Amino acid sequence: GVFCGELCIKASCSIPGCECIAGLCYKN
């Protein structure tokens, strides 16, 4: 639920532990 400060285009995030949700990277 915490925004990782990264946008995701290909449903992948470069920041470890972060997942792509609705175009944004979130972690918990």
Curated annotation (Swiss-Prot):
Pfam families per UniProt: Cyclotide (PF03784)
Tell me which Gene Ontology terms the entry assigns under biological process. Answer: defense response
**What InterPro entries does the annotation carry?**
Cyclotide, Cyclotide_sf
What UniProt keywords apply to this chain's record, in alphabetical order? Disulfide bond, Knottin, Plant defense
Which Cys-Cys disulfides exist here?
A: C4-C18, C8-C20, C13-C25
User: Does Disulfide bond appear among the keywords?
Assistant: yes
- Coiled-coil positions are none
Q: Does the keyword Oxidoreductase apply?
A: no
Q: What does the PTM comment of the record read?
A: This is a cyclic peptide. Contains 3 disulfide bonds.
Q: What is known of its domains?
A: The presence of a 'disulfide through disulfide knot' structurally defines this protein as a knottin.
Q: What does this protein do?
A: Probably participates in a plant defense mechanism.
Family, according to the entry, reads as follows:
Belongs to the cyclotide family. Bracelet subfamily.
Stated name of the protein:
Cyclotide vodo I2
